[in-house]
A protein has these predicted regions:
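Non-catalytic terminal accessory segments
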Residues: 1-141
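N-terminal active-site segment of His-dependent metallophosphoesterases
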Residues: 4-22, 29, 60-73, 119, ...
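Soluble catalytic domains of enzymes that build or remodel membrane lipids, polysaccharides, and related
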Residues: 156-404
Length: 404
């Protein structure tokens, strides 16, 4: 993930302090119900020891990132991310609910309000805390298959019923070499017996060393007609400091070579033609292309160059922004597959209702989108980065069937 500036870190720490001061004020009211001064003082000390420890840890981590071992760095960032969210969000909700209830209260007397309202607020804080903890320890690896059927007028008849598995955003460094975690995902994928497996980028967080041992795991993925992949923004090493461009390039080459080890064809602004009994479709793949601040390595015209005569095309492009900017109404690409957003790893993801804060940044953030005869599917991703949890946004394996 992209590094935060010291200014943003200081703002975060100030926000934590402000919310904790308000929370502590209302905590004093709740603890009036406790008669033991020892217990009360223990609660107060524990409250501030945690807050001071968290802020100190965040600042120290930021100040030492440049010299820290990369493996340890990634683990510590994720740990502090989880601690910060688990602490800050419930306290913010608690403080907000209690303050609103207290200053708009016309039911309880002032004396009653100082005790009853904070208790109500306490329950309002416990709920998000439970959701966050559940998202960290239970939802993070609860892989979900989403099955959809898409109809195309231009689909060649010999490709009727084509079975595609679409996965994205593995971020293998976040798994900390716990290879068994992906066993169930691989089993779910292979049970579908797909014709194609498409991976749309962000194999790693930053570094090629994250891939150690994963070739034996990912090589188990099976597809009848082929496995294809493209690169995501994290695969270029752009979010790390390197001793030299040569070292950065070496890291990049190792990441690209990994795809050969797991029998995936990496499409770098290229296309591949698949033929069944004389009928053809084209599978295109571009390097990462995103709106600023993301780089635009992708060259769609280059990938289209040798397949203009193939009427049915599938595009693999990591960032869904690419679809709106360069694909829709500018090409005849029938289906585009993307990832990148993770669904923010948080939101409401029901059958008829989907919402996530990420939708205010990305118009196309999760699920199926259509513009005339062109489709885009954005997966919520299989892995995670930053916050070590998923809140209402389970990791996704997409199973797509193509029909006429």
């Amino acid at each position: 993930m992209r590094p935060f500036s010291f200014f943003k870190i200081i703002l975060l720490c100030l926000a934590i302090v402000v919310v904790d001061i308000i929370t502590f004020y209302w905590l004093l009211s709740i603890t009036q119900l406790i008669t033991s001064s020892l217990i009360k003082n223990s609660i107060y000390i524990a409250f501030w020891v945690f807050t001071i420890g968290l802020i100190t840890g965040i600042i120290l981590l930021k100040s030492r990132l440049a010299t820290m071992n990369t493996y340890r760095k990634q683990w510590l960032i994720s740990s502090f991310y989880g601690l910060s969210v688990s602490s800050f969000v419930p306290k913010l909700i608690f403080a907000t609910v209690v303050s609103i209830l207290y200053f708009t209260n016309y039911v309880f007397s002032e004396k009653e309000s100082l005790i009853i309202i904070p208790i109500i607020g306490l329950f309002s804080g416990f709920l998000p805390f439970f959701i966050i903890v559940y998202g960290i320890f239970r939802t993070l690896y609860r892989f979900k298959i989403r099955h959809l059927k898409i109809k195309f007028e231009g689909l060649p008849k010999n490709f009727e019923g084509l079975r595609i598995i679409h996965i994205s955003d593995l971020h293998l460094g976040s798994f900390n070499f716990r290879y068994h975690i992906l066993d169930r995902a691989i089993k779910l994928i292979n049970n579908v017996a797909p014709d194609f497996i498409f991976f749309t980028g962000d194999l790693v967080n930053n570094y090629a060393w994250e891939l150690k041992g994963w070739d034996k795991v990912l090589k188990q993925l099976s597809a009848k007609k082929g496995k294809y992949a493209v690169l995501g923004n994290h695969d270029y090493g752009d979010y790390s400091k390197w001793k030299s461009l040569k070292v950065k390039q070496s890291n990049f080459e190792l990441i690209k070579y990994f795809y050969k080890k797991i029998d995936f064809k990496l499409l770098l602004n290229k296309a591949d033609i698949v033929e069944i009994d004389g009928e053809k479709i084209a599978i295109l793949g571009v390097e990462n292309w995103g709106n600023p601040p993301f780089k635009q390595y992708g060259d769609l015209q280059k990938s289209l160059k040798n397949v203009t005569n193939i009427p049915f095309k599938i595009l693999l492009s990591h960032d869904p922004s690419h679809w709106k900017e360069e694909v829709v109404e500018k090409t005849n690409i029938a289906l585009t597959l993307s990832g990148h957003t993770h669904g923010m790893q948080a939101g409401i993801d029901l059958k008829n209702k989907n919402w996530s804060p990420i939708q205010y940044k990305y118009k196309h953030w999760a699920g199926l989108y259509k513009n005339n005869k062109q489709y885009l599917y954005v997966t919520r991703g299989l892995g995670w980065i930053g916050f070590p949890g998923r809140l209402g946004m389970r990791p996704e394996i997409t199973f797509i069937e193509l029909h006429k």
